[in-house]
Amino acid sequence: MRIVLQKVSHAGVTVTDEAIGELDTTFTEQTIAAGYVLLVGVSDADGTRQIDWLAHKISNLRVFEDEQGKMNLSIHDVGGSILSISQFTLFADTRKGNRPSFVRAGKPEHAERVWLEFNEALRAQGLQVKEGRFGAHMNVSLVNDGPVTILFDTEELGI
């Protein structure tokens, strides 16, 4: 799995109905105050081991400032929330040509299942998690706080 974590002061996501180019009224805008936006990419090799490791790491990561201005507090400590967005493009291969290849991204059925299980694993850690819609064209807005942006790649980490 590949995750781009962004610490935010607030964020939101809407879904666009591609057929008419307007907001999809069947999707309620999801918003959070302080917390994380997670852009989540899944490969076919990802499963329970990666889900559990990432959920534990992200829920305990200390990137919020304490009274002394030191990054010493977790998302639990500040009562933050998570906005989780599936994003297969994190597995783009740009080594050849000018059009990225996405062959390393997980097949949609597998990727959706892993993404949803990951979100549930975060909830099991006691976190409030809001979601975009898998496979949809989404408009994500956020205010990056810091900025703090951290990349997780379980393959690179050997997990």
Swiss-Prot record:
Gene Ontology terms: cellular component: cytoplasm
Single GO molecular function: D-tyrosyl-tRNA(Tyr) deacylase activity
Location in or out of the cell: Cytoplasm
CDD domains documented for this protein: Dtyr_deacylase
Keyword terms, alphabetized: Cytoplasm, Hydrolase, RNA-binding, tRNA-binding
Keyword Transferase tagged: no
Biological processes per GO annotation: D-amino acid catabolic process
Record remark: domains: A Gly-cisPro motif from one monomer fits into the active site of the other monomer to allow specific chiral rejection of L-amino acids.
NCBIfam families: D-aminoacyl-tRNA deacylase
Descriptive protein name: D-aminoacyl-tRNA deacylase
Gene transcribed to yield this protein: dtd
